[in-house]
Regions:
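Solvent-exposed interaction patches of small proteins and small membrane subunits
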Residues: 1-154
Length: 154
């Protein structure tokens, strides 16, 4: 069976996001194995910084690519006209269609990402709290991606 260009774009976007989803999980396992806590976070060694940088990069890429590539590609494959939709409208439409559990939760995940990547508090405990929030958000992103995977394979 031949795929439409929209279906091919959707498959490409899904594969891209899946590639980003694996790397944060790997770095998170390594971070947990190292036992990085608030005290250690204030004085990270070179290897720990690399792990956190890898996590931060892949986490932000996953969030960005899901929002800018996978979600629009999903809507296009469903026959929706995304050109006239704002990002918030796309999230709301995906929620209506049952592809996204909550547009508001997605917005919260975006806010966590923005705080993690753009705000640099001086206090190490605040930075560590933002890392913890990003770790939890990464797990939620993986769950959202799994929801999209199940819908795409239907």
């Amino acid at each position: 069976m031949n795929q439409t260009p929209e279906q091919m774009a959707l498959q490409h976007s899904l594969a891209l996001c899946q590639g980003h989803a694996d790397a944060p999980q790997d770095s998170l396992q390594d971070i947990k194995a190292r036992g990085i806590g608030v005290d250690e976070y204030a004085n990270l060694g070179k290897e720990d910084r690399r792990l956190l940088d890898q996590f931060a990069y892949r986490y932000t890429r996953l969030q960005d690519d899901m929002g800018t590539k996978l979600m629009p590609a999903s809507l296009k494959a469903l026959g929706e006209n995304v050109a006239a939709m704002s990002a918030l409208d796309r999230f709301a439409r995906l929620e209506q269609l049952g592809w996204l559990a909550s547009a508001d939760e997605w917005q919260t995940l975006r806010q966590i990402r923005n705080q993690f990547t753009h705000d640099y508090p001086n206090n190490p405990s605040e930075r560590f709290e933002r890392l913890q929030a990003a770790v939890n958000a990464a797990a939620q992103l993986t769950a959202v991606l799994a929801q999209f995977q199940s819908k795409i394979k239907m």
